[in-house]
């Protein structure tokens, strides 16, 4: 059908007035063309309780994890289905203090989706994919992605084989990493997890950085984005759910973040995914599960927590051939410095390595307070050369000898010359410890082995023997 010439000329003259209407019509057409919105299944609110409400009439049409919506005078409000029974389903509202009443109409919305786009870099959004940085609306990408996607099939993934430098000497020497690896930073509160994460976020090996700040203090969010990330924010997307937000938003933030990271990975980018912290994600799941009536099974944690943790973390890693990688570095807050609490224990078994931060080292002023003996990278052999592996093994032996004889030396039981290995440990380990010190505002270490070699050679010139002259491998 051809537009009449008179109408065509009129549209050209007043295009500035017609274009917004056409854009609105196109948006509505795309919205209603989605089969999900062709038919709306609805129900009514039956009961309301703290943390959840129940809906009748939807049990046959919804699945666990799907979203529903209801309209109020203040807008449309979302909730997640967390339990389904024959007559009713339980819904946890996304927003705290959501206005809802008995007999309100609730509509099924299906899986929650986001539409990541390249233009999201440099932006800060909430768990729903909405901008919170005051820089205007977000552009929607072509592909709408469910935040509850499954991990890629294991046999379709590339192998993890390419090492990269983090710029943190203690990690690059003792626990080196590879692109596509999943690493956990384990520590108690106030030891320096977020500080170490900020140092790792500055690594040059990544095309994109996606950050999930879960349960963080509100005042720290802007400081982290503006001060810590700085210029690196231009290639980063921050997903934020602060501690005062609802457990549903704190649960959704890491899921939205990994979905955005998957988008960039599928575009061929090497992505760094930072989640701070996985423990608060687990706490949010626990709050939602307990509100739905799920019983706790391990120190107050319901079984669904241990189902959701691997589902989240397994989504990171390498993609299929021709795509990029997601390197996940996540923090785990250990309760009472107990590294065997259920979340820490479960997460340690899922990840490809763990960095342990020691409170006693932080109290001594050694930053980052990484315990090199307790920290492990399961892919270190792919990053070390044979000579580097021998060197690190020797360094760990010296550090272990130094630490296990600390009490003996304090009471005066050490006599130089009686144990050559202990003599070397006493002379060299303090130099090693001093070399590993690194403040967040210091430049990233370009060659950690060269820095260590220089320090040890300086010690040798002062009469101390070298550990190994072949430092670079």
Swiss-Prot record:
Binding-site list for ATP: 187-194
Catalytic activity: ATP + H2O + 4 H(+)(in) = ADP + phosphate + 5 H(+)(out)
A single cellular component GO annotation: type III protein secretion system complex
EC number: 7.1.2.2
Enzyme class: translocase
Keywords, sorted A to Z: ATP synthesis, ATP-binding, Bacterial flagellum biogenesis, Bacterial flagellum protein export, Cytoplasm, Hydrogen ion transport, Ion transport, Nucleotide-binding, Protein transport, Translocase, Transport
Pfam families with a match to the protein in the record: ATP-synt_ab (PF00006), T3SS_ATPase_C (PF18269)
Superkingdom of source: Bacteria
GO molecular function: ATP binding; ATP hydrolysis activity; proton-transporting ATP synthase activity, rotational mechanism
Gene Ontology annotations of biological process type: bacterial-type flagellum organization; protein secretion by the type III secretion system
InterPro entries: AAA+_ATPase, ATPase_a/bsu_AS, ATPase_alpha/beta_chains, ATPase_F1/V1/A1_a/bsu_nucl-bd, ATPase_T3SS_FliI/YscN, FliI_clade3, P-loop_NTPase, T3SS_ATPase_C
Entry's localization field: Cytoplasm
NCBIfam families, per database record: FliI_clade3 (TIGR03498), fliI_yscN (TIGR01026)
Record function comment: Probable catalytic subunit of a protein translocase for flagellum-specific export, or a proton translocase involved in local circuits at the flagellum.
Family of this protein: Belongs to the ATPase alpha/beta chains family.
Official protein name in the record: Flagellum-specific ATP synthase
């Amino acid at each position: 059908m051809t537009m009449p010439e008179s109408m065509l000329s009129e549209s050209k003259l007043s295009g500035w007035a017609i274009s917004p209407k056409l854009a609105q019509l196109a948006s509505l057409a795309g919205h209603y063309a989605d089969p999900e919105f062709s038919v709306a299944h609805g129900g009514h609110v039956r009961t309301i309780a703290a943390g959840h409400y129940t809906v009748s009439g939807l049990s046959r049409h919804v699945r666990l994890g799907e979203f529903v919506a209801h309209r109020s005078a203040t807008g449309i409000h979302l909730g997640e289905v967390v339990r389904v029974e024959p007559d009713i389903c339980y819904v946890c509202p996304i927003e705290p203090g959501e206005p809802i009443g008995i007999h309100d109409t609730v509509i099924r919305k299906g899986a929650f989706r986001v539409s990541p786009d390249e233009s999201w870099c440099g932006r800060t959004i909430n768990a729903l994919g909405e901008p919170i940085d005051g820089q205007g609306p977000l552009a929607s990408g072509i592909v709408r992605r469910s935040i509850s996607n499954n991990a890629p099939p294991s046999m379709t993934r590339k192998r993890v084989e390419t090492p990269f430098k983090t710029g943190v000497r203690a990690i690059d020497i003792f626990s080196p990493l590879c692109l596509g690896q999943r690493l956990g930073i384990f520590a108690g509160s106030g030891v320096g997890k977020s500080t170490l994460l900020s140092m790792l976020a500055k690594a040059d090996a990544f095309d994109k950085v996606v950050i999930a700040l879960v349960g963080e203090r509100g005042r720290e969010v802007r400081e982290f984005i503006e001060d810590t990330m700085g210029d690196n924010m231009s290639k980063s997307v921050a997903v934020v759910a602060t501690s005062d937000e609802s457990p549903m938003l704190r649960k959704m933030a890491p899921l939205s973040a990994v979905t955005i990271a998957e988008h960039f990975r599928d575009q061929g980018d090497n992505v760094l995914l930072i989640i701070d912290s996985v423990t608060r994600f687990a706490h949010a799941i626990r709050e939602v599960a307990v509100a739905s009536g799920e019983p706790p099974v391990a120190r107050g944690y319901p079984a669904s927590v241990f189902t959701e943790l691997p589902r989240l973390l397994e989504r990171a890693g390498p993609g299929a051939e021709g795509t990029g990688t997601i390197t996940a570095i996540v923090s785990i807050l250990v309760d009472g410095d107990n590294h065997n609490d259920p979340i820490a224990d479960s997460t340690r078994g899922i990840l490809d390595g763990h960095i342990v931060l020691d409170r006693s080292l932080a109290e001594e002023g050694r930053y980052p307070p990484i315990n090199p003996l307790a920290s492990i990278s399961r892919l270190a052999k792919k990053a070390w050369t044979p000579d580097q592996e021998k060197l690190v093994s020797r360094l760990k032996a010296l550090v272990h000898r130094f630490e296990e004889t600390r009490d003996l030396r304090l009471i005066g039981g050490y006599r130089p010359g009686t144990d050559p290995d202990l003599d070397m440990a006493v002379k060299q380990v303090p130099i090693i410890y001093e070399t590993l010190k690194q403040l967040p505002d210091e430049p990233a270490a370009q060659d950690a082995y060269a820095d260590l070699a220089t320090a040890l050679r300086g010690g040798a010139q002062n009469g101390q023997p070298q550990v190994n002259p072949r430092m670079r491998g």
